[in-house]
Amino acid sequence: MKIYIDADACPKTLRDFICKSVMRTKTIAIFVSNSFINLPRSPFITIKVVEQGFDIADNYILEKAQANDLVITSDIPLANDLISKGVAVINFKGVEYNKDNIKQSLGMRDFMDMMRSTGVLEPSQMGKQKPFSDKDKKTFADTFNRLHTKLSRMLKNDLK
């Protein structure tokens, strides 16, 4: 199992949590970004800097992630594509995307995108994204730990 992180939008507190967790559990984490980010030195932590451009990091993650890997991203179309490959996906707020909820999330995202692009929603009506809270961090940590444990157990069972 590998963990891929869509690192450009990942809050620093989550990067720190993920790094500590993968060093403790000896799990490989690959932070994918279009610019360098400072991460701890560890044989379990890699940063993959991709070219600048639309969906370059997403395409790298989609190409490399395999069934039973874990991807951390808030990109809903990417999550949809990954789920169809059997990849576990969570966002930065700790929401697990799966085959039961991804279509609804994708539909809402597309609807809001259409509302913005047609001018029905003005920027002032959209509101600002809420700041990342301690509750968000706890929810993320709980979901991350649950999925990490589940995927690790599946891997161990496959090796038997």
Which stretches of residues belong to each language-model region?
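Nuclease catalytic cores that cleave nucleic-acid phosphodiester bonds
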Residues: 1-160
